[in-house]
Amino acid sequence: QMCIRDRGWGRFRNEQICRLKIRRIKEEWAQNLVARPWCISEVVRAHEDCPELQAILDEYHKPVVIQDEVLGELTLDKDYDAFEGEIQWCGKGVRLSLEVNAESKPSWTRARNAAKRLVTDQETWDKAMRDFAAKNLTGLANNWLSQDEESARDPETAPITEEEFAQRILLTEVSVSPGGRFTAYYNDDDMFWGHAVEVSGSLKKGITYANLAG
C-alpha cells in the first residue's frame, strides 16, 4: 500500500514560479499504476524569476471577452473552461454558461451556436422544460410537502398540481455544451426546501432528465 506523507502539501501557492528537480517515482510506489509518474526530488528555488513563464502567466490573466449579437457579452472563465454571461429569457435575466475547451476556438463557436438556437426558440423550450419537470417532480413535491410540519397546506386535500409546479419554478441559469446538450437550473420556490430543480436535454433529442440538485 502506498504511503502518503503530508510533508510538503501546501508548500506551493497558486501561480508560484519556482525551480525544481524532478524524477520518476520509485517503482515500488508505482506497481499498480499504468505509467510511473514524476515527483519532486528537490526545490532548488522556491521563488524564481523567469520572464518566459511570467509572460505566459500575464497572458493567461488577460480577459477573453466575446460580444455576440444574440447572447451579449461573454467572458471566459479559464479556471472552469466556460464563457459566462447573462441573457434575457422570457423577459427575465438568466445566467448563461457555455462549456468549452478554452484552447479550442471551434468549441467556442459550436457552443455559441447551440445557445443561440436555444435562446431564439426560448418560449418553446421554456414550456417543454417546465412541463417535463412538472410531470416528473410534482409527486415528489407533494411528498416533501407532506413532511413539512410548518406548512398548513395538506397535500391530500390541496396537492400541488403539475400546472402549479410549472408556474412556480424560476429559471436562474442555463448551461450549454458545444455538442448541443444543455442543463437548466430552476429556483424551487421552496417546494424542495431550497434545492435547485435541474432539467437537461439536447437540441437533437429534446428534454430527457429532471431531478433535484444542490
Q: What are the residue ranges of the model-derived segments?
A:
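Flexible glycine-rich surface loops and low-complexity tracts that mediate binding to linear polymers
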Residues: G10-V34
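A structural detector for beta-sheet-dominated domains
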Residues: K21-R23, D77, Q88-C90, S97-N101, ...
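Broad gene-expression machinery/nucleic-acid interaction feature
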Residues: I17, A35, A82-E84, G93-R95, ...
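Short, small-residue-biased leader/transition segments that mark boundaries at the very start
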Residues: M2-I4
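C-terminal structured interaction module
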Residues: T161-G214
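Contiguous hydrophobic, core-forming segments of folded domains
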Residues: E59-A128
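Short peripheral tails and domain-boundary helices/loops at the edges of structured domains
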Residues: R36-Q67
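Long, charge-rich alpha-helical interaction segments
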Residues: L98-N101, K105-T161, F165
